[in-house]
Amino acid sequence: MEVRVGGKYRLGRKIGSGSFGDIYIGANILTGDEVAIKLESIKSKHPQLLYESKLYKLLAGGIGIPMVHWYGIEGDYNVMVIDLLGPSLEDLFSICNRKLSLKTVLMLADQMLNRIEFVHSKNFIHRDIKPDNFLIGRGKKMSVVYIIDFGLAKKYRDPKTQQHIPYREGKNLTGTARYASINTHLGIEQSRRDDLEALGYVLMYFNRGSLPWQGLKATTKKDKYDKIMEKKMSTPIEILCKHFPFEFITYLNYCRSLRFEDRPDYAYLRRLFKDLFFREGYQYDFIFDWTFINTEKDRASRRSQQVYVEDNRQVEENQNELPM
């Protein structure tokens, strides 16, 4: 039996699941366009889909922000219909044998900084910056990095008065321990600086293949979080970034030097990585490590289906992502 949501969306197969619900592929029955459909039980102890859909609407129109097509209740589920995107950076990292080239890391850093700055400009912090929460687009948008999953996002300042939330301590860890900032581990209320520090750990994860605080043995979740914090605090940034360009050390030192209410200098951080990019002689051509891996898979898939599609390299139209 065909299941429909929102009157015009057909529910297809399950493509993923998270702590708050399941994600299905779907299609607009009028246009045939594919979409992603997120379902959350209305009995959920901590419902977050309505909150997340409101966040997407607030951020709507930003580059690398998926569009919500419909939100509502169907039967026993809260339902959100949203743009269908490509694989996550975690998926692509695995496809690339868990190591990314410096060129790919720097092109990602540029876009990821843009996404985080845009979210911050709308008075919210993400609070769960990790490779799984950045996805690439599909088709013509294959070179665009999208930021997703705003279930843990929090307003850090009043949109009217610009009043920042107060400094607080004794907070539980929100987000993913592997990438959490040291201040988050210490129970300090998160602010803009923490999203950026988390991004620094994501970039080093891509560079190195893993982080020193991965795979630590522990009996309880608290014990594990404590061990991750101890290892993170006792690993000097210079050791974490050893064998990699000094810009990564500069980036993390800068993030850790920010005070709670400070507005980060996003342009400075982008420039830091762009200068390194051009010093290395790279071309800003949006060819990532996975571009040709995917192309080979696509070609095999097309051959098997006996369908010929001209192989075009797509370059993002957005001028904001291009080097100055």
UniProtKB/Swiss-Prot annotation:
| Positions bound to ATP | 15-23, 38
Reactions accelerated catalytically = L-seryl-[protein] + ATP = O-phospho-L-seryl-[protein] + ADP + H(+); L-threonyl-[protein] + ATP = O-phospho-L-threonyl-[protein] + ADP + H(+)
What SUPFAM superfamilies does this protein's entry cite?
Answer: Protein kinase-like (PK-like)
InterPro entries on file: CK1_Ser-Thr_kinase, Kinase-like_dom_sf, Prot_kinase_dom, Protein_kinase_ATP_BS, Ser/Thr_kinase_AS
Uppermost EC category:
transferase
Documented EC number(s) = 2.7.11.1
* Residue ranges of domain Protein kinase in the record: 9-278
Query: Could you name the active-site residues?
Result: 128
Q: Which GO terms describe its molecular function?
A: ATP binding; protein serine kinase activity; protein serine/threonine kinase activity
Read off the PANTHER family from this record: CASEIN KINASE-RELATED (PTHR11909)
What does it do? Answer: Casein kinases are operationally defined by their preferential utilization of acidic proteins such as caseins as substrates. It can phosphorylate a large number of proteins.
Entry similarity comment: Belongs to the protein kinase superfamily. CK1 Ser/Thr protein kinase family. Casein kinase I subfamily.
User: Could you tell me what this protein is called?
Assistant: Casein kinase I
